Structure formats: C-alpha cells, structure tokens
Amino acid sequence: MKLNYGIIGTGMMGCEHIRNLKKIPDVKIVAIADPNERSRKWAEDTCEDAFKLRLYEDYKELLAQEDIDVVVIASPNFTHIEVMRELFKTDKHVLLEKPMCTNLSDGIEVLEKSKKHKGVVWIGLEYRFMSPIQSLINHVNEIGNIKMLSIREHRFPFLEKVDNWNRFNEKTGGTLVEKCCHFFDLMNLMMPSKPIKIYASGGQDVNHLDERYDGKVPDIIDNSFVLIDYEDGERAMLDLCMFAEAGKYEQEIVLTGDRGKLETHIPGNEVLLTNRQEYSHRTVEIKEDSRVKEVGFHHGASYIEHLELIDCIKKGNQPLVDCQKGFDSIVLGLAAQESIKTGESINLNDFLKNEYEI
C-alpha cells in the first residue's frame, strides 16, 4: 500500500517532515502548499529529485486533490484551526503539528470533529518517541510508585519565522503552549493519574525586548517555573529558560518513585537508575531505535512518528497520539499561561468549565 502525501506549510518543520518521508519506503510526496514563495522553494530544494511536486499557494487547492491520502499540517499555529476545518470536509488522514490549536475553544472544536472523521487524526507530539524517553518508560517499573517528575529545558531563544508570527501570544498560544506542549504531553504520558491543579510563574525578561513588528512589542515569555498537582498526589515541575544556550544538555528529565529514580539528558545516551533500598546506582545505555534512517532535529523521533502513523493507517488502528492527547497538552499550557497572568493557581476542572475531564 503506497501512500501519497501533501504537505501544508513548508517552513522549517514542514521541510523536516519532507526529509523524513524521503527515507521511508512506499511513500510519495505529491504536493505542497505554502503562501510564501521562499518556503515553497525550500520544499523543492529539500525534495531534490526524490519527488515531483505540485506547488500550491492555497492549501485548499491541495486538499481538493483526490490522489492525496495523507496531509501533514505544519503551517503556523494560529492557522491550524482553519486548515483543520477544511480538512474535516475530506476523508484524508492527517498529521497535525503541535500545538493542536492556540486556544481552548478551537481545541474543543478539533477534538469533537476528529471523533467523526473517517481518516486518522494524529497530533505531532514526537518527543514521546525519542530514545531517552522510551528508555525511561522501559525502566519505570524499577523505581516503584511514581511520585515526582521534573523536566528542565534550558535552550536558545525562538528562531525567526515567516512574518515573525512566533513572537506573539495571540498567534502561538504562548510559549507554554507553543514550546511546552511537548513536555506537558510527556508528563501526561508518564504520570499515573490526571492533573488537577497548575501554578506557573514566568515572564519576558531577556528575549525580543528591543524588537518591534508593525509597532508591536513581542509578548512571549522566555522563562518559567510550572508546578502541577495530580489527583493521586503526584507532582510535576517544568523549568524553562529560553536564554540559556550553549549548555552541555538542552533537556534534563528526572522521574522519581518511592523505590528509586531515573534520570536522563537530551542530547545524551545514558539513563541513570538509582535504587534506594540497595543505596546504589547504575548507568543504562540508551539503545537507539534501529529503524531510524533520518535523525533530523528531534533525534530520530519524527522518523519514528511517521512510521507509527503509517502503520496505524495501514492496519486501521487508533492513533497513538490522538486529538485527546493533543488537547490535554494544550490545556496544561493554556492554564499555565493563565496562572502567570493572574498570579493564582488554576483548578483545571474549573478552567475547562466542566465541559471536559482531562
């Protein structure tokens, strides 16, 4: 079964998908759509001679092509809702890049419509497929009952995007949605119960302060601490800094149970496993997934994501990363942004106005 792909949005992430799909058998990219001429040229250059592309400025023309089986939506965050509304008029499969949407009402709309859609709807939260994360999950039974999870990301500022759309909360959903939905998804993946309350403190203290776009000053935060309480008493914490480049590690993850602790770093090739009873620790080498043919920006996770999506489509299975998981990840980000704005902790059931349980 050969699958024909169309890519909507061919900036940095769209071209990342193209590089991955080039290495996967029985896949053909037949069309791309992007209103920006330079981005369309990037897609052509990335494809090289692997695919003969049809180029569109308007994504609606791409969605109208009957020979396209799977659509990858990698357009700017704020466009996701309008593109998905059009996609839901078709039966095509879709990989929708993170974040699923930039606000709660749009997220609920996509979630509800996805339940009736004939095609697979997959959300691009590929961090869960990184080898260090998979290694943590493989050893989680060795640390007993999980009590705490800490994720630290200290990295470089946001890169420049077309028309600088990623400088403003209204177009990104906010830093804790745009960037950190990945980490909230990992928390939801690893923690044994549901989140019930969130508190965040953060601000824009260093980055983009001297930038102006059409007279507007960027308002995206560049650092934050986020604390999450879970219904069975577990706790999770996110430590984010966007002006901390040049460190040895970009991400550090610590998962603590009542019998031990797991630690890993990204980039890195080891997991440290601590045993309280034996008062000992040992290092476990991370085994890279042998299926990976393209490492890309995310340590091979995007490649595995595509393999899993293709397998899901061919076998008629439910997606591993469905709209509910995508929705849950943005709920935490949006609630954290609200907590920073109000200075108060946010009860998640109240935040959702009793419409959904996460």
Predicted regions and their residues:
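Conserved SAM-binding strand-loop segment of SAM-dependent methyltransferases
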Residues: K52-D58
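C-terminal helix-rich "cap/oligomerization" subdomain common to oxidoreductases
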Residues: I7, D26-V27, C47, V70-V72, ...
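Active-site loop of classical SDR/Rossmann-like NAD(P)-dependent oxidoreductases
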Residues: E16, R38-S39, E294-H306
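N-terminal Rossmann-like dinucleotide-binding module
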Residues: M1-A50
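Contiguous beta-strand/loop segments that form the cofactor/metal-binding neighborhood of enzyme cores
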Residues: D185-E270, Y303-K315, N354-I358
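Predominantly a Rossmann-like dinucleotide-binding segment in NAD(P)-dependent oxidoreductases
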Residues: Y127-V217, G343
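Short, Asp-centered acidic motifs that coordinate Mg2+ and/or phosphate
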Residues: A31, V70, M148
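Beta-strand-loop-alpha-helix segment that lines the small-molecule cofactor/substrate pocket
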Residues: L63, D69-R128
